[in-house]
Amino acid sequence: MAIRRICELPEPVLRKKAKKVPSIDGSIQTLIDDMIETMNSADGAGLAAPQVGVSLRLVVFREPDTKEATVLINPEIIKKEGQRQVTEGCLSIPGYFGELTRAETVTAKGLDRHGKACRIKGTGIVAQLLEHETEHLDGILYIDHLESEDQLHEIGPDDEMPEEIRE
């Protein structure tokens, strides 16, 4: 396992639509392990493959209750319900966080790291992680949802970003 460099804006890979993972082989398993290690090292809540420079449809995130990493390969959001105001940050946009609207409940499907079909229904922070990380795969960042510059805030040198918004 290795800690990979996290890409930051304006790196082009963050704005590209990622390609489907064609097969789950040893290189994908290594990528998954590296992404989990990178996410944990950066104290992030989630990470998408484009954030480590790999344009593939693969995300990892940590569920707050268990801190275990969840892996979704070729994820697709199939249902969104409700709305809630959230505060959100991103490892690829360091030093900032924004206030935006996300779904209260999100259902996604994809494959786990072993290629088995899975479905995840998340509420609250898990729904937020599913939306945020899956959007990375289409080149969409949370800042694209901000309605005004007033919703984007800079983190001062003595400020610490709350854990729930480190994505």
UniProtKB/Swiss-Prot annotation:
GO terms for biological process: co-translational protein modification; translation. Fe cation binds at C90, H132, H136. Keywords: Hydrolase, Iron, Metal-binding, Protein biosynthesis. Its cofactor is Fe(2+). InterPro entries: Peptide_deformylase, Peptide_deformylase_sf. The active site is at E133. The keyword Zinc does not apply. Binds 1 Fe(2+) ion. Its EC number is 3.5.1.88. It holds the Pfam family Pep_deformylase. CDD domains: Pep_deformylase. GO terms for molecular function: metal ion binding; peptide deformylase activity. It catalyses: N-terminal N-formyl-L-methionyl-[peptide] + H2O = N-terminal L-methionyl-[peptide] + formate. The keyword Iron applies. Belongs to the polypeptide deformylase family. NCBIfam families: pept_deformyl, PRK00150.1-3. Removes the formyl group from the N-terminal Met of newly synthesized proteins. Requires at least a dipeptide for an efficient rate of reaction. N-terminal L-methionine is a prerequisite for activity but the enzyme has broad specificity at other positions. This is Peptide deformylase. It comes from Dehalococcoides mccartyi (strain ATCC BAA-2100 / JCM 16839 / KCTC 5957 / BAV1).
